[in-house]
Amino acid sequence: MNITTILFDLDGTLLPMDQEAFTTGYFKSLAKKLAPYGYEPKSLVDAIWAGTAAMVKNDGSCTNEQAFWKKFAAIYGEEKCQSDQGLFEDFYANEFNAARDICGFNPASVETVHKLKECGYRVALATNPIFPHMATENRIRWAGLTPEDFEIYTTYETSTFCKPNPAYYLEVARSLGAAPEECLM
């Protein structure tokens, strides 16, 4: 079987970054945004990590979004989570974009994605689906690309597994209607 589909990672691949510096800057910005609403910074970061762990352990019975918020609600309470969800959405639409300054830029990323598409390959973004679509779309733009450059891109709303679970890659292939052996990561 021939390779028909190219899957790219985002963080550290299409979007150059020091993962530790990015995570530190991202959490600092999120904590600053949410502190006035009763979120103590260290507790918030711990809760985000707990929600992330819940997504990584997701068995496919729910979306990663549902796994995250279930864990987050267990820490902060269902009512607070529901009332404050808009604060998180506003953060990803606005303050999150300051993290772009922490990331690098590689024009070869844009050139490579476009060239592969010109050559007839299907191109998908198989980034670890631990972020909402808005954050993923922003990071795609930071790399000089657009969401439309990809046939699909994974987010916590649309995925039920995370890396490194092999089921994540099968889920991506199924979403594309491609056989796993047709895909190159």
Regions found by a protein language model. Give the residues of each.
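Substrate-recognition element of Asp-dependent hydrolases with the DxDx(T/V) motif
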Residues: 90-93, 97-105, 109-143
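Hydrophobic alpha-helical core bundles mediating ligand binding, dimerization, or RNAP-core interactions
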Residues: 23-31, 48-53, 69, 88-96, ...
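A ubiquitous short alpha-helical element
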Residues: 13-19, 53-57, 122-124
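Substrate-recognition "cap/lid" segment bordering the active-site pocket of phosphatases
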Residues: 124-184
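Short, solvent-exposed loop/turn segments at secondary-structure boundaries
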Residues: 18-21, 59-60, 100, 164
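Active-site neighborhood of HAD-like aspartate-dependent phosphohydrolases
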Residues: 1-50
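A metal-dependent, Asp-based hydrolase signature
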Residues: 45-94
